[in-house]
Amino acid sequence: MKKCLSLLLAALMLAAVLTGCGGNPSTEETDAPADTGTEQAAQTNWNVSSVTGTGTELKFRTGGDQGTYYGFGSVLAQAITTNGNGTKVTAVVSNGSQDNIEQMQMNVAQLGFVQSDVMSYAYNGERLFEGFPYADFSTVAALYMEQVQIVTCDPDIKSVADLEGKTVSIGASGSGVYYNALDILAAYDLTEDDINAQYQDFGASADALQDGKIDAAF
């Protein structure tokens, strides 16, 4: 199963930043050069936000401190800070996709990694977002496709169906891994209640597998 990881920017916070940096908005026309990046994005139907103006500070929600997202996010934040014309981006540990969207919605953060399926749930008010749709964000960039892997040290577990009754780490609640796990289990007519679910990040899952505390991990 492949998922697309996206970098999101809270649209409401973007408006606040631009207003704070630029003073009172003006309706006067200027001879400023066109934003060719935005024009190109429009031609390719990408949903992006173009950030211009003076420097600012942005909080960047990533993932667990032992996972890929935090490491990648830290490198990305440093690259933007170094080359961002005065913009300082700080990578912050988080509980994953749902947490990142919620923190942006509360104006605690301005950037975040979110898997494309979780982004859709938030926008449409589905699953854990039911009744509370979040639409105040924009996609900055699509990053890369992901593959979901199930890891086990138990030779008797040969398929997803064999996870029934087992102790399985399915990621932090609300994370992209968590939603992936539920979807994969459902494809085999299993639910969260059919396993002894553990809600651990990648690092904790690896340690638990090694110590024999869990049977498998997503």
PLM features: what roles do these ranges have?
Residues 1-56:
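Short, low-complexity disordered leader/linker segments with a strong preference
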Residues 36-53, 78, 111-113, 133-136, ...:
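Extracytoplasmic/periplasmic mature domains of Sec-exported, cell-envelope-associated bacterial proteins
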Residues 130-143:
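A structural signal for short loop-to-beta-strand junctions that line the ligand-binding cleft
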Residues 74-78, 90-131, 150-153, 203-208:
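Pocket-flanking alpha-helical
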Residues 113, 217-218:
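Periplasmic-binding protein-like
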Residues 55-83, 87, 146-213:
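Bilobed "Venus flytrap"/periplasmic-binding protein-like clamshell domains
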